């Protein structure tokens, strides 16, 4: 049966995902940046309360995946922290200036991760040559690759995802970006074994007082009185679709 991973941005969302049938959680901060490394406090609280597998993302900033020496040092330290806390896996990825996997740095990450299952995240979708990259990731011992098939959403990239799945000795290919209940059957019919979804929605802040003339964001148009949460009903619906597909 296909595995359902839910992207979560808080301990509460991870619990919601677990309670509604998620098989695994990708734990992140900063949804508007596409996911950054969660704080130590969030990592500890999730580790204490969530019982399904949780894989934190290790990504020090938004933007590209080519990092300075200082940023890479922080990545390695975060990898060690996640390992010490007892998480079963993590999610990360580093590219070089030419859009290839930075093999020397990824080898250091894999050494620091030790027995943890490492997912190479959507840095894969920014690489120059996906099949060459897939061979490199297999050589590194990467457990899985999260990808939209190098398109803006995974449904548009489904043909590429199928090509990657068919590639000999490839890591597990997990489809993600825009995967929802209404299009999930396309991925299941294509033989995708793992799917990744935020299964979420923006929820209004409970604050009654709002200083509309002031923003804490560099984006003056950002809505700072909303937060992204996992929709438990959406998770349960996706899990039900997977179970019914398996029963066919």
UniProtKB/Swiss-Prot annotation:
Entry's family note: Belongs to the CutC family.
Molecular function as annotated in GO: copper ion binding
Gene3D superfamilies linked to this entry: Copper homeostasis (CutC) domain
Protein name, as recorded: PF03932 family protein CutC
Main location: cytoplasm
Compartment(s) of residence: Cytoplasm
Keyword RNA-binding: no
GO CC terms: cytoplasm
Gene behind this protein: cutC
Residues of the signal peptide: none
Any Pfam family matching the protein: CutC
NCBIfam families from the UniProt entry: PRK11572.1
Keyword list, A-Z: Cytoplasm
Transmembrane stretches, start-end: none
Subunit composition and interactions: Homodimer.
PANTHER family: COPPER HOMEOSTASIS PROTEIN CUTC, COPPER HOMEOSTASIS PROTEIN CUTC HOMOLOG
InterPro entries on file: CutC-like (IPR005627), CutC-like_dom_sf (IPR036822)
